[in-house]
Amino acid sequence: LFESKFIKVFDLQYREDRHYYNATRRDENDLVAAKSTEEFKKMLPDAVSCVVIWNPSGDDEKSGHEPCLLMNREFRYPTGQYLLSVPAGLIDPEDCTGDNDNTAPLIKTAMRELHEETGLKVTEKDTVSVINPCLFSTPGMTDESNALVKIVLNRDSLNGMSQEGAVGGELFDGFDLLTKAQAKKILEDGVDEHGIYYSVYTWAALTYFVADLWR
């Protein structure tokens, strides 16, 4: 029904005169609705969202070296607002080469997006792992999916942070380093400190951090 570089709309006719419209990032031969159960279980998501935690040494509140959740302010065009967001991006074809392990493309994408959106590179001291391999955003209207990947930055400074790596239509407006108490307040309030709503992936990152599931 419609096709652009990043979005397509398909008419899923599930029985005679019964139609369901699906907004997707996928080509017709890769639609999730047409996959078998086994194909569904093995598929890669469209994108990766990153839960990025800065974990300086001397980890305790009294020392002032408390771990923080690193988030950014990204303009999301359908909302018309800068939203409190996690570093995230689509899986590129080159992320899927050279390894049969389904987690490898997720890790590669997460590391690339961290560098593009924050200027930071993962080092041997840091840890990267998959939290969830595939989550659906809004399955009532789209088959778009994201993996959640944890990146723990085990370092005493975040020197070199920058948003100059933005590509395409990406627009950023700074970073937020949230303590556990600040993240908990945003969860309880349902909005950020500016009174702006946020995405379900931001909610997931806040919850994961506050619950100490990253440790």
Language model regions located:
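N-terminal leader/linker segments that precede catalytic domains of diphosphate-processing enzymes
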Residues: L1-L83, L90-E116, L120-Q163, D176-A181, ...
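Short glycine-enriched loop/turn motifs at secondary-structure junctions
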Residues: A166-F172
